[in-house]
């Protein structure tokens, strides 16, 4: 599968027009229906190659845009969703530094 | 690691990788893309901003400006605006508070204008060293002053933006850090002051990106 190609599992004769929001690989139990004890095994079955991860992010982004950004009367929500997500991301990658801030009172 | 007032400007993140620079590209996620024929509110808003800027920069460039040369300044504006504005949210790194970024925007731009101007319009560039209406006795001094002012342009452009961003963030952190040792009544006032400052800084974020774009437009219109 080269860059920009359809996923290898996609077959236009079976699936019809290509939908960028859809996963064409072998269907697994949806995450919402996974029992707590099976989460480890479920995660173990995920395809974690860079290609697959990029594909998953791409599908999620597509779905998110269609739900929140593309509608004609889209509100301010997607902006704040992105902002909060970015804030969380930068908080997490800076946590090793930020955790020292609780010692400010001793400075 | 010792944290201090300036740790908000530290690009290094987990494992000492400079991952905080990633925030430079947050704007790419914010640009509304078009899918449906009918534009969404985001598209309408974004288009009207771009159109207004286009008209603004077109008049600044004057009749000698080439078609489409406003695009680079509009892109410059939006890049800086997204960086300035997103940097005001907690934990998000402000790339424009570093000369590394602002100077890498301003210096190549200025260098291109200079090379273009001096190679293609040498006479015109020399003429610019003496502004119209300068008394003859002041002309030698004006040449010196104009030369210096021309050479420091990339520096002033970059430092103006960086200093503004640093000043705003320092003010917010300094004031915010006094909170823990305050009484509850004073904290209410502190909160109000911080909100007012945040509004002010949002305005500064927009104004400074506009200033950067407008000045580079004017510099480009001077060389042809």
UniProtKB/Swiss-Prot annotation, chain A:
The keyword Membrane applies. F-type ATPases have 2 components, CF(1) - the catalytic core - and CF(0) - the membrane proton channel. CF(0) seems to have nine subunits: a, b, c, d, e, f, g, F6 and 8 (or A6L). This is Putative ATP synthase subunit f, mitochondrial. Belongs to the ATPase F chain family. Keywords: ATP synthesis, CF(0), Hydrogen ion transport, Ion transport, Membrane, Mitochondrion, Transport. Mitochondrial membrane ATP synthase (F(1)F(0) ATP synthase or Complex V) produces ATP from ADP in the presence of a proton gradient across the membrane which is generated by electron transport complexes of the respiratory chain. F-type ATPases consist of two structural domains, F(1) - containing the extramembraneous catalytic core and F(0) - containing the membrane proton channel, linked together by a central stalk and a peripheral stalk. During catalysis, ATP synthesis in the catalytic domain of F(1) is coupled via a rotary mechanism of the central stalk subunits to proton translocation. Its main location: mitochondrion. GO terms for biological process: proton motive force-driven mitochondrial ATP synthesis; proton transmembrane transport. It is found in: Mitochondrion membrane. GO terms for cellular component: mitochondrial membrane; mitochondrion; proton-transporting ATP synthase complex. The keyword Membrane applies.
Curated annotation (Swiss-Prot), chain B:
The keyword Amino-acid biosynthesis does not apply. One of its GO terms (cellular component) is mitochondrial inner membrane. It is found in: Mitochondrion inner membrane. Coiled coil: none annotated. It comes from the Eukaryota. Keywords: ATP synthesis, CF(0), Hydrogen ion transport, Ion transport, Membrane, Mitochondrion, Mitochondrion inner membrane, Transmembrane, Transmembrane helix, Transport. InterPro entries: ATP_synth_F0_asu (IPR000568), ATP_synth_F0_asu_AS (IPR023011), ATP_synth_F0_asu_bact/mt (IPR045083), F0_ATP_A_sf (IPR035908). Belongs to the ATPase A chain family. F-type ATPases have 2 components, CF(1) - the catalytic core - and CF(0) - the membrane proton channel. CF(1) has five subunits: alpha(3), beta(3), gamma(1), delta(1), epsilon(1). CF(0) has three main subunits: a, b and c. Mitochondrial membrane ATP synthase (F(1)F(0) ATP synthase or Complex V) produces ATP from ADP in the presence of a proton gradient across the membrane which is generated by electron transport complexes of the respiratory chain. F-type ATPases consist of two structural domains, F(1) - containing the extramembraneous catalytic core and F(0) - containing the membrane proton channel, linked together by a central stalk and a peripheral stalk. During catalysis, ATP synthesis in the catalytic domain of F(1) is coupled via a rotary mechanism of the central stalk subunits to proton translocation. This is ATP synthase subunit a. The gene is mt:ATPase6.
């Amino acid at each position: 599968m080269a860059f920009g190609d359809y996923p290898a599992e996609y077959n236009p004769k079976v699936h019809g027009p290509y939908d960028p929001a859809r996963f064409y690989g072998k269907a697994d139990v949806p995450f919402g229906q996974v029992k707590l004890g099976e989460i480890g095994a479920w995660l173990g079955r995920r395809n974690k190659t860079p290609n697959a991860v990029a594909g998953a992010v791409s599908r999620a982004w597509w779905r998110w845009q269609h739900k929140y950004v593309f509608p004609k009367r889209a509100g301010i929500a997607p902006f704040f969703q992105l902002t909060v997500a970015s804030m969380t991301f930068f908080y997490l990658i800076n946590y090793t530094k930020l955790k020292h801030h609780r010692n400010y009172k001793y400075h | 690691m010792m944290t201090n007032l300036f740790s908000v400007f530290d690009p290094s993140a987990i494992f000492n990788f400079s991952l905080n620079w990633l925030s430079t590209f947050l704007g790419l996620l914010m640009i509304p893309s078009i899918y449906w024929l009918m534009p969404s509110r985001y598209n309408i808003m974004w288009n009207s901003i771009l159109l207004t800027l286009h008209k603004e920069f077109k008049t600044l460039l004057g009749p000698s400006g080439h078609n489409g040369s406003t695009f680079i300044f509009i892109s410059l504006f939006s890049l800086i605006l997204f960086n300035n504005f997103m940097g005001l949210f907690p934990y998000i790194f402000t790339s424009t508070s570093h000369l590394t970024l602002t100077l890498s925007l301003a210096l190549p731009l200025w260098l291109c204008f200079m090379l273009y101007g001096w190679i293609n319009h040498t006479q015109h560039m020399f003429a610019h060293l003496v502004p119209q209406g300068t008394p003859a006795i002041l002309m030698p001094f004006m040449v010196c002053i104009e030369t210096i002012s021309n050479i420091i342009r990339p520096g002033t452009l970059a430092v103006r933006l960086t200093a503004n961003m640093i000043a705003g963030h320092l003010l917010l952190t300094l004031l915010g850090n006094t909170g823990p040792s305050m009484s509850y009544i004073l904290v209410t006032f502190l909160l109000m002051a911080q909100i007012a400052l945040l509004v002010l800084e949002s305005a500064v974020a927009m104004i400074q990106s506009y200033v950067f774009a407008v000045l580079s437009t004017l510099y480009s219109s001077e060389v042809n």
